[in-house]
């Protein structure tokens, strides 16, 4: 069986299942496609014990030259189905989900600014093909949805029989997950499916399920104080224990800090910054977190260790608590340490 035959069979199986089971919700469609398309290592860790074996597409990129290095690395990938594994130059994090989400967040922001504000029809067309690959990967691998695309551009991407050169090359990139298998005989079934797209064209149902397109134009709500407190669930010790008392004391200070951030009184820090520090993402992915973000507590032994730390692969924010040797600093000092941590954009903060 050829690679092309395998892809065609995969598309047919997904199509039949979606149609036969009347799955119309865009999020449910995306979840089903992710399950059946992405291969290799698990996209997310469900616990610290989750094995990290399995095939990946490994890329190494520079935060300071992200467009150039990412386009080189992603452009060289031939099979886009395996889980993407990202390493930033000079940083020591092992990617089990966190660095990948961080990569998608950063690269989509730069793509938006450089290529879509406004669209640059005279840019290198191969750039738009690589952009299409990145958009498809981001959607299928728990990254951000590309919600910066103009509504008319989304319609052209799905439906136009005479697209612009920019859209034509975006299609090529988006279609690369399915070897550009579009418009062939398997796309006919009771006139229900007019266009099958992988991510946005070769597998996801676009023309006959226009509600799917709203994923591209629906803006994520701004995170609120209530939303942040609800999302970052504290993991306390047993009630009545000395440790629980210390944890509650620190958590109370942290919620005060969240109020300061929410009110705009901590310069350059937002609630999104804190979520990003804990998870690698500045908003909840469209398919949700495999493991909900949580706050854990660890005993502090030195002054510097009152800095928060995180494990973005399991979405864990750790807040130090006082020990017998070291009492809790003042709120002013703690808030300053929290600022230092949450303003950090590099993996490997010590």
Q: Predicted regions span which residues?
A:
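C-terminal catalytic/scaffold cores in eukaryotic proteins
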Residues: 45-58, 62-71, 80-82, 154-350
């Amino acid at each position: 069986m050829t690679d092309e035959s395998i892809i065609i069979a995969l598309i047919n199986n997904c199509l039949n299942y979606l149609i036969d089971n009347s799955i119309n919700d865009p999020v449910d469609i995306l979840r089903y496609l992710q399950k059946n398309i992405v291969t290799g290592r698990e996209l997310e860790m469900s616990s610290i014990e989750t094995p990290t074996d399995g095939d990946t597409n490994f890329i190494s990129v520079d935060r300071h030259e992200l467009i150039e290095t990412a386009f080189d690395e992603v452009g060289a990938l031939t099979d886009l189905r395996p889980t993407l594994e990202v390493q930033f130059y000079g940083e020591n994090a092992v990617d089990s989900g966190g660095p990948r989400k961080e990569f998608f967040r950063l690269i989509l922001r730069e793509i938006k600014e450089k290529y879509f504000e406004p669209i640059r029809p005279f840019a290198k067309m191969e750039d738009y093909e690589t952009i299409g690959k990145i958009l498809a990967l981001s959607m299928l691998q728990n990254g951000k949805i590309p919600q910066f695309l103009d509504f008319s551009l989304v319609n052209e991407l799905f439906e136009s029989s005479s697209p612009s050169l920019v859209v034509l090359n975006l299609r090529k990139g988006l279609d690369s997950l399915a070897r550009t298998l579009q418009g062939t005989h398997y796309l006919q079934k009771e006139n229900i499916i007019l266009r099958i797209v992988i991510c946005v064209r070769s597998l996801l149902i676009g023309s006959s399920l226009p509600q799917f397109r709203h994923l591209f134009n629906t803006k994520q709500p701004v995170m609120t104080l209530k939303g942040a407190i609800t999302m970052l669930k504290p993991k306390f010790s047993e009630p009545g224990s000395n440790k629980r008392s210390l944890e509650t004391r620190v958590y109370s200070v942290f919620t005060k800090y969240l109020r300061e951030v929410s009110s705009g009184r901590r310069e350059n820090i937002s609630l999104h910054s804190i979520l990003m520090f804990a998870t690698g993402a500045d908003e909840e992915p469209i398919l949700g977190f495999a493991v909900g973000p949580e706050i854990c507590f660890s005993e502090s032994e030195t002054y510097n260790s009152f800095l928060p730390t995180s494990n973005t692969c399991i979405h864990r924010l750790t807040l130090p608590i006082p020990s017998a040797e070291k009492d809790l600093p003042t709120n002013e000092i703690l808030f300053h340490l929290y600022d230092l941590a949450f303003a950090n954009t590099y993996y490997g903060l010590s």
